Amino acid sequence: MATVKPPGRGCGALPRWLLGAALLLGLRLCMELRHAGSGPPGRGDSPGPPRTHLLSAPGSPRGARRRQVTYVRSGRRVLPRGGGSTTSPEPSCCAQGGLLRRKGSRWHIELQPWAGPSRSLDEEASRFLSYISTTQIACDHMGTDSLATDSSPAPKPWLVCLDDRFGLAHQIRSKRCRLYSLGLGSDDTHFEVSMANGGCEVHRFDPSVKSAHVLERQGLWHHRLSIDWRDPHPAVAAQKPHGNTRKLGSILNEFGHHKIDVLKADLESAEWKVLENLILEDVLEQIGQLVFEIHLHWPGFEVSGSESGVVRFWYSLLKELERKHFRLFHTYKDLTKPQLFLKKDLFNASSCYTLSWVNTKWR
């Protein structure tokens, strides 16, 4: 006896099977499309941010700062890749440091009280000239030519203190001394050459140097850079990425130098604003000794105000040095220069003095 199938069962199984297969196929296609979307973008995709290609020295880390010295060559230190021999295991003279210094929190120095109730030029000049003519600490061993013996006298008394208690002599003997010399077209390099011969790493900054960085002899570098109290405006710096004007703190960052044993400066009346910048940005903490030539025949670049106010500003800067533990150990009055004080023949003053300070907290 024949059996009768319920209506609709045989025909309904096929559509459900096809529906399941189609669903599985769809899920697989979605997964493949999603995986393909994570790959490189197509030509029509919007590009990412542009990449900046920076010039860096051989061996410098990726992502190094834009403004950095692009050489590591020195006569007595490690030479760059690609040839040359090394005569010392010490690091290269201007290694890529990329230091990030904390800037000072002040915008202005603290002005000292007026010298007298009348706020006159006579009162201010008398106090200032007495201050720069009186040493504050004794130095038993002063030298113009490092520890080397040299019979030729230095044209100017650029004196450093070589007492063992201040550490410079030890740094020279151990060949770890570093000197920065700031100038404007001076041909007098006796002091720099002598310190280099004595074992110091010397960097002379002068915008009149023909090449960007020149190694004259072992340990003596010349850089076509001018030290200013401000960095160039960012718009100007972008147009001239290799501009030759920079603050001293910026130079230290670019060269990767943490400390300067001696800072010598002959800046032809720019010294007052440069010194102010060193104070406000706490760069003085990185300096062991200062040897500055100061000029008194006019206020100096971007120093304004009444005559008595200008002298008060000068005096306040030097008192800031004292607060930073710098003590005057030598003073020299240049009698070969015009005897002028703010364009006047007054107070028996010279227009030019050379002053030497030592940082008593230097380690």
Swiss-Prot record:
Keyword presence, Methyltransferase: yes
EC number: 2.1.1.-
Bias (Basic residues): 63-79
Family annotation (InterPro entries): Methyltranfer_dom, METTL24
Localization per record: Secreted
The keyword Nucleus is annotated on this UniProt entry: no
GO molecular function annotations of the record: methyltransferase activity
BP term (GO), one: methylation
One GO CC term, this protein: extracellular region
Enzyme kind, highest EC tier: transferase
Keyword field: Methyltransferase, Secreted, Signal, Transferase
Region (Disordered): 38-97
Domain of life assignment: Eukaryota
Signal peptide: 1-38
UniProt cross-references to PANTHER family, sorted A to Z: METHYLTRANSFERASE-LIKE PROTEIN 24, METHYLTRANSFERASE-LIKE PROTEIN 24-RELATED
Function comment: Probable methyltransferase.
Family recorded in the similarity comment: Belongs to the methyltransferase superfamily.
Protein name: Probable methyltransferase-like protein 24
